[in-house]
Amino acid sequence: MAEELKPELWTTSSNSALKLSLVNDENAVQFSPIFTYPIFGQAEQLFGYQDLNILLAFDSVTFKPFLNIKYTKKLERGLDDVEGSILKFLPEGDVILKDEVEWVDAFNGEREKFALPNSESKVAEYTSGGESFAIFKVHLSDPNIRQLHRRMQIFTLLFIEAASYIDEDDSAWDIFMTFNTSTRQCIGYTTTYKHWRYINGQEFDSSEKTTKRAKISQFIIFPPYQSKSHGSHLYSAAIDVWSKEEKISEVTVEDPNEAFDDLRDRCDFMRLSGSGLSSSIPEDVPIPRTWLTEQARKYKLSLVQFTRLVEMILLYDNSPNFEIQVKARLYQKNHEVLTGMDSDTRKAKLQEAFTSLKEDYARILQKVPNRRRVLPSDEENAGESKRHKKE
């Protein structure tokens, strides 16, 4: 009885207790979630058990789910419903509980009928590590895709901050999925949404056609396949598709985290550099806003994102205009604050902001293929290790 009166003995971190697995023909790759608050609450704690171990496993091909919850002791009342909490976020009636043999038989049976999306939906292919991969643009109207997505969407809650399930009945959603073409394993996917874009009244009145904005919502590469360039290929495939769609006027990203910001910056930088943009950047400093706006529309990027990329290109090319361009933009952006300072303080603050941004650009560019040195050697480590807020 005394033991039951000590809450700390019955409280477990849900992040530590939950173990995820993707099972292939050879082994099971186990990893932990980053977040569990969407399932177990903001505190990410579970009460009422000792030595709690939650195994949530998926077949790496069909994503057929398996759940097994173990513990050495539990309270008779007042304990959290661990199983019920998890099952709310998985397809109803689809989860195999505790019986591993039944689960293996079930997903092996499903594998016999499992097929990749049809070839007409393939939008890109590539090789990595001696294996072949393909990216497909698919829709939830396909019952096979809908079932697969229902099973894997719980990963977005566990690895993406503030993620939520999408409305699978909304036809505006498209999904880009990457598959290993030999094993049929899904490597990762991104959910995307297209909606009507209103720019301003003048352009709306003068335009004969409506345009849409494409938005990347959720983007995930499953943990066993990360750090192998699959994310870059997936992002680039979606951008390539939208760049050819006349009705898409801009591509945006919904609440990106820092890692995705970096991936997007590198991919966009490579795309713009490969297009020959560098040779067309005006020598005027600061760069005219009219040119930036026109080119941002051409590449279907927001003005803020495009301006950042142009500045990265100037740094990459060691352009003497880089520092002047960045400082001019930072001064204009922070004009009201800076004008209230004396001259020496203003110069120091502007230099501090410039140095911080330059280091951040350099850190990103250091991971670009075939990169050149863009910072002196004594600054390179600082750029590699620090993450600065974007300006």
Curated annotation (Swiss-Prot):
Residues binding acetyl-CoA: F219, I220, I221, Q226, S227, K228, S229, H230, G231, S232
Site positions per UniProt: Interaction with histone H4 N-terminus: W173
Region (Disordered): 372-391
Uppermost EC category: transferase
The enzyme's E.C. designation: 2.3.1.48
Keywords: Acyltransferase, Chromatin regulator, Cytoplasm, DNA damage, DNA repair, Nucleus, Transferase
Gene Ontology MF annotations: chromatin binding; histone binding; histone H4 acetyltransferase activity
Active site: E254
Localization in the cell: Cytoplasm; Nucleus
Record-level GO BP terms: double-strand break repair; subtelomeric heterochromatin formation
Assigned GO CC terms: chromosome, telomeric region; cytoplasm; histone acetyltransferase complex; nucleus
SUPFAM superfamilies: Acyl-CoA N-acyltransferases (Nat)
TM ranges: none
Pfam families the UniProt entry points to: HAT1_C_fung (PF21184), Hat1_N (PF10394)
Reactions accelerated catalytically: L-lysyl-[protein] + acetyl-CoA = N(6)-acetyl-L-lysyl-[protein] + CoA + H(+)
Region: Interaction with histone H4 N-terminus, residue numbers: 193-195
Function noted in UniProt: Catalytic component of the histone acetylase B (HAT-B) complex. Acetylates 'Lys-12' of histone H4 which is required for telomeric silencing. Has intrinsic substrate specificity that modifies lysine in recognition sequence GXGKXG. Involved in DNA double-strand break repair.
Subunit structure: Component of the HAT-B complex composed of at least HAT1 and HAT2. The HAT-B complex binds to histone H4 tail.
Family that this chain belongs to: Belongs to the HAT1 family.
Protein name stated in the entry: Histone acetyltransferase type B catalytic subunit
Gene that specifies this protein: HAT1
